[in-house]
Amino acid sequence: MKKLPRTVIVLGFVSLLNDLASEMIVPLIPILLATVIGAGPVALGLIEGVAEALASLLKLWSGRRSDALGGRRKIFAVSGYLLSNLARPLLAFAGSWGTVLLLRAFDRVGKGIRSAPRDALVADATSPEIKGYAYGFHRALDNGGAVAGSLVAAAVLAWSGLPMSQVILLSVIPGLLAVALLALGVKESAPKSAIKRLPPLRIADVPPRLRRYLAVLAIFAFARASETFIVLRGFELGAQTVELLLLWSALNLAKAATSTAGGRLADRIGRAHVLLIAWTLFALSFLFFGKIDSSAGLWAVTVFYGLCFGLGEGAERAAISEYGDAAAQGTAFGWYHLVVGLAAIPAGLLFGSLWQWQSPAMAFFVAAGLAALAALLLRVWAWPSKTGGAPQGDTVLRP
């Protein structure tokens, strides 16, 4: 197994610091909405859905723009991380769910600007045979930062006596450290000549194999509603704030535990095989979520869900990196983020509405069904072709 490039390692630690900052805040949002602002599951679904969809529109633009500039991607990554880490701490002053929505939107705009160019930086620096490993490593450190963030928030709340608002403000410290590490530690490849005029952006011009994969991903994204609903479920079951932060930490630790191994496995046996396993287990975990009625059960299922989720993270992104031309990696990742993110609004509203007007169990059961459908379509409609000399682990799909 080849060594990971320095760029991939540094970007991994940038994500670790950024997620440390982010996850000091994100698991507190459903608690903030429920206890301070008095908003319900539909508001939570709308906030998370709108924020993710807005980010996704920008991900396609930023990825495509970084391609047009000859692979100049770092400026987009730095700008995006900076915006997010200036906007997030202001949630400490939010007094209405509309303000929470606005600030989450600014946070996600930053994510939208940085994500596709950052993923393309990883692709630019990595040889094809270790792409799954590279993305799995990156996701593992990202999830490791999420573990650390929620643990830091729990420790501060438990032992310092500071209110939630001050914990949120403290997140600016690791966030700005992430920006500094990226600005000083990543050196991108020498840029190619800028493209004076990009071809029109049309979904019809996307290769059929990629369109099929994106369609399946969109269905899976409908199942993958915001994980803050797991926190809300714990709150409804009577868990206290510190316990919920520890639960969030356990979720992300479970993701980190399988992310790198899942990426390596995808490089060996094929990305589609790993995705099929991960998505099937994901559907099973949501069936379990619908049946639990105790805090202990929630802990067990949350850890199981995290292990399943982490298993497929590296494979999902490594697959995308194989589809576009080397000069259009940013655009390929932009399409990926756009499709997944645009599903976030209807997914969040559907999940929140089922939760509020039917039951939490119904919301989880519907999500499980959608995940199972995505796994089935991956196998029967968008499965990799072994023709055409694709390398082992390649996920080129049949036209």
How would you label these PLM feature ranges?
Residues 172-194, 374-382:
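C-terminal membrane-cytosol helix-exit motif in multi-pass small-molecule transporters
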Residues 46-64, 249-261:
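Central cavity-lining transmembrane alpha-helices of secondary-active solute carriers
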Residues 31-36, 148-168, 346-362:
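Transmembrane alpha-helix termini and helix-breaking/packing motifs in multi-pass membrane transporters
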Residues 1-5, 188-217:
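Juxtamembrane intracellular "pre-TM" segments in multi-pass secondary transporters
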Residues 57-95, 266-272:
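Conserved MFS/SLC helix-loop-helix module at the cytosolic interface between two early adjacent transmembrane helices
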Residues 75-89, 172, 273-288, 368:
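Structural signature of the two symmetry-related core transmembrane helices
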Residues 113-126, 311-324:
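Intracellular juxtamembrane helix-capping segments at the cytosolic ends
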